[in-house]
């Protein structure tokens, strides 16, 4: 079992508590920052060591090491996100669907059929799918700094240029209040659209303002960036664009087009 340690002159431990804070049951995160301790040694393991409990769904393998995305996303953030938050969503999803018809469905089928008044299934199915896509949207060494191939042509058509898309995507991420996600989706007509969702909702659910197949996902929950960027969400969004796996996003685009018969 391979591990490495990082020595800090101080260590800030951030605990995230999910609260329901208004009439719309919107989830937000309260961040508690205790006084730092000196010379704290943090041991970071391997994502391959993390296993979900037996059930219908297992963790999507993280396609890089915890430290691979640094300095854009540092190892402690990624380790906490993958081995704590994502693992919990996966285990809770399996509990929620145990001995139900959902056990034999794909996650996409579950998201399309679930009862939106069932918060346990809604939040955990969404959390599982959203994170599973998010991990694959990033890579330590992107082959391109922007969209390529078929996707680049579609962006030019729908948004005018890649740079226009980038500006619009960042603007939507910045506008999103509280916990949620920003997406690039292929809608039912085969067109690219940018949209946001609250909490762990996504464009595959029945309540989506812009329904479609997600091909690019950015997590805007504070646990995704607070250890690295604190309240500077814009810096996190900028950093995300440094590590987008455009080759994978282009594959996602072609697959999504095939689903709506536009290939």
Regions found by a protein language model. Name each.
Residues 232-236, 240-263:
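Low-complexity, Gly/Ser/Thr/Pro-rich intrinsically disordered linker/tail segments
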Residues 22-24:
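Bacterial signal peptide processing site
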Residues 1-9:
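Bacterial N-terminal signal peptides that target proteins for export
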Residues 17-20:
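C-terminal motif of bacterial Sec signal peptides marking the signal peptidase cleavage site
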Residues 73-87, 108-129, 209-215, 219:
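Alpha-helical scaffold segments that form or flank carboxylate-/histidine-based iron centers
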Residues 42-65:
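Acidic, low-complexity proline/glycine-rich segments
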Residues 174, 179-230, 238-244:
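An amphipathic alpha-helical core segment
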Residues 84, 95, 99-104, 112-196:
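All-alpha RGS (Regulator of G-protein Signaling) helical domain and cognate RGS-like helical scaffolds
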